């Protein structure tokens, strides 16, 4: 009986321990869950405190534009437009967190006009679409063409015309004010740009010259191959001909050459100095006298032979 009572006490104490352990475990899990929730909230709070910055850059005419949009966690979004002249390197800037209101209202029929308020985020999207050449036709951006002086402001004109309402135009002027820039730095930028242009031009000339050299090398290679082929054919032809065949070929080509009067005149002109040197008038006279003597001797022999023949006519022949 005592043993049973002891066992019952032990069982009851174990049950109490199990209950206490379960309570402690549940409490620990609850604390862990709370810690995880606090961490997530802290992460969300930190992420909400981070400002997101977007930036685009493009050229228009003589100016370079850098548009920067900051999506702030407090909802006070900001847009900044920086403009730089690409040759003189004067700078202008515009920054706002306010709604860009209508600057000028026009109506062809003097009736109700448009009044569209554009927030910085929307303005940034308009410039982004312009930079990507995807800007809707309802928006027209007029960029400045030139500037008056380094101290004068420049203006960007933004026009909005809604479909089917072309009689109503919403116009906004965004004024960019001049920024101070160190004159030494500005001149340095100008020299850097000039040096870049010179290097770019030299590189273009080098590429052009290299291309011409490659074309010349290709032509030279083709011509060399042509000459080698011709010499190879000549060598093969000369090896296959005998001396007699070569002589006959030369005579045939020479006769063909002499059939054209202009070529004969060329030969005569070429031989004239030699003929004038060796064929003199004295040599011609001696040769003429020699030929006359030969002709007289030949005529005398012929006359003697003729006389003997005549005598034979009168000689009596035996019967």
Swiss-Prot record:
Family of the protein in this entry: Belongs to the mimivirus R73/L269/L862 family.
Name this protein carries in UniProt: Uncharacterized protein L862
Source species of the chain: Acanthamoeba polyphaga mimivirus (APMV)
Regions annotated as coiled coil: 200-253
Keywords for this protein: Coiled coil
């Amino acid at each position: 009986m005592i043993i049973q009572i002891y066992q019952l006490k032990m069982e009851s104490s174990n049950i109490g321990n199990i209950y206490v352990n379960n309570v402690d475990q549940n409490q620990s899990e609850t604390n862990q869950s709370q810690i995880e929730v606090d961490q997530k909230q802290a992460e969300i709070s930190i992420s909400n405190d981070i400002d997101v910055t977007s930036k685009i850059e493009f050229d228009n005419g003589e100016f370079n534009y850098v548009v920067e949009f900051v999506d702030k966690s407090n909802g006070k979004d900001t847009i900044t437009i920086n403009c730089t002249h690409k040759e003189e390197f004067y700078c202008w800037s515009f920054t706002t967190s306010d709604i860009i209101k209508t600057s000028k209202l026009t109506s062809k029929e003097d009736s109700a006009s448009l009044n569209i308020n554009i927030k910085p985020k929307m303005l940034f999207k308009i410039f982004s679409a312009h930079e990507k050449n995807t800007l809707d036709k309802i928006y027209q951006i007029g960029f400045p063409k030139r500037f008056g002086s380094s101290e004068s402001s420049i203006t960007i004109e933004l026009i909005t015309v809604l479909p089917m309402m072309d009689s109503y135009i919403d116009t906004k002027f965004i004024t960019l004010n001049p920024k101070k820039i160190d004159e030494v730095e500005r001149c340095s930028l100008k020299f850097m740009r000039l040096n870049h242009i010179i290097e770019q031009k030299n590189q273009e000339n080098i590429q052009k010259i290299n291309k011409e050299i490659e074309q010349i090398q290709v032509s030279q290679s083709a011509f060399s191959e042509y000459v080698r082929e011709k010499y190879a054919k000549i060598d093969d032809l000369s090896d296959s001909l005998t001396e007699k065949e070569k002589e006959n070929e030369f005579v045939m080509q020479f006769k063909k050459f002499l059939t054209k009067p202009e070529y004969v005149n060329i030969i005569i002109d070429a031989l004239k100095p030699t003929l004038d040197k060796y064929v003199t008038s004295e040599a011609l006279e001696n040769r003429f006298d020699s030929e006359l003597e030969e002709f007289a001797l030949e005529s005398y022999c012929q006359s003697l032979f003729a006389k003997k023949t005549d005598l034979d006519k009168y000689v009596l022949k035996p019967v």
